[in-house]
Amino acid sequence: MKKIIAILFAAFLLTMCDTSKSAKGSAKPEVQYKDDFRSASEKEKSALLKKLNATGADYSVLILTQNYKGEQIIVSNEQKTLYKEYPISNKKTGIADEIRIDNTVDTKVYDNLGKKEAVLSAKEAKKHKYIYLMKNPPGGDSPFRITYSNTLRPLE
């Protein structure tokens, strides 16, 4: 009788001990397509593209925007790591950093603090010169908001 109770108790405990499913990294980023905001001047566009050496059709510019607070961000593609820094968003401009990416291959952006990842597909990046990546506040449905655009917002 004691053995049966012990077995039932052990079975009950094992059924209660279920592995918790973590949502880390599994949430998909929000994706937007916008060209309806104020544009930077042609002089500012060409200066940015020259600074990043991104004037060719095979390159897009990834712009890290809001909610970056010094956590490590790693941007890489299948060929190499493009960026591994600790960006901080400027409160006035809302810009943390700009990075040139190769738009012929998929690009991964990884937030080392939140253990979240976003993938910028080559198919979408090829269609847009500027890609804005905003980090959503913790606890939201998605870790990032990606905005694809052919319009450069003023960076100053």
Task: Describe the role of every protein-language-model region.
Residues 18-156:
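Terminal leader/tail segments of proteins
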Residues 1-4:
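Positively charged n-region of N-terminal signal peptides that target proteins for export
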Residues 14-16:
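C-terminal motif of bacterial Sec signal peptides marking the signal peptidase cleavage site
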Residues 6-11:
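Sec-dependent N-terminal signal peptides
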